[in-house]
Curated annotation (Swiss-Prot):
This is U7-lycotoxin-Ls1b. Keywords: Disulfide bond, Secreted, Signal, Toxin. It is found in: Secreted. It comes from Lycosa singoriensis. Expressed by the venom gland.
Amino acid sequence: MKLISFTGLALLLIVSLIDVEAQNEGACIPHGSVCTTNHAGCCSKLSCDCYRRFEKGVEKGQICWCIETGVTFSKE
């Protein structure tokens, strides 16, 4: 009986570890998607860059996107 319980728990642990690994592989944020300011989660070769929005000289908040590393946007 102890062997069956141990085997069941070991199998459950292995299945849980496989599931967590599969979730981590596809968890990156794609290009152009909104991200957070912690700079984590963007897919490889992308960085989370944040820009402040202004309307009529009043700041309306900050928005962050996953974009190519080293690219900056400016209003001309």
